[in-house]
């Protein structure tokens, strides 16, 4: 049983290593590949969670990713941000510009 467990762990480690190496190879190849929808959504969610939401939460608001349709990112502004007169500025400056810088310059953010 121990030998079997070790072999399984080694197989998983080897598979993970191959995946990491392939990712590094693609990243270092200089070729730009278009993001898949899953990758794009994951990156958008990561930027929102790590860079945008903490700022909005500090002001009594929040943002939720609603949908992604091509380069259109639909979000729901919540809390104080939902009724704030500056919500358009928040949408364009705090959210859209950050997503454009981090992911793709052609992204457009819309409130729903």
Swiss-Prot record:
Gene Ontology BP terms: iron-sulfur cluster assembly; nitrogen fixation
Transmembrane segments: none
Alphabetic keyword roster: Nitrogen fixation
GO-annotated molecular function: iron ion binding; iron-sulfur cluster binding
InterPro entries documented for this protein: FSCA_dom_sf, NIF_FeS_clus_asmbl_NifU_C
UniProt entry tagged with the keyword Glycoprotein: no
Family: Belongs to the NifU family.
Protein's job: May be involved in the formation or repair of [Fe-S] clusters present in iron-sulfur proteins.
Protein known as: Nitrogen fixation protein NifU
Organism encoding this protein: Anabaena sp. (strain L31)
């Amino acid at each position: 049983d121990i030998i079997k467990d070790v072999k399984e762990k080694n197989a998983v480690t080897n598979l993970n290593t191959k995946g990491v190496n392939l990712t590094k190879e693609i990243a270092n190849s200089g070729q730009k590949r278009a993001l898949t929808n899953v990758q794009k959504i994951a990156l958008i969610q990561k930027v929102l969670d790590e860079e945008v939401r903490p700022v909005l939460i500090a002001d009594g608001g929040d943002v939720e990713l609603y949908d992604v349709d091509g380069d259109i990112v639909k979000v729901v502004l919540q809390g104080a941000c939902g009724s704030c007169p500056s919500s358009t500025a928040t949408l364009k400056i705090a959210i859209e510009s950050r997503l454009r810088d981090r992911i793709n310059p052609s992204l457009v953010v819309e409130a729903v």
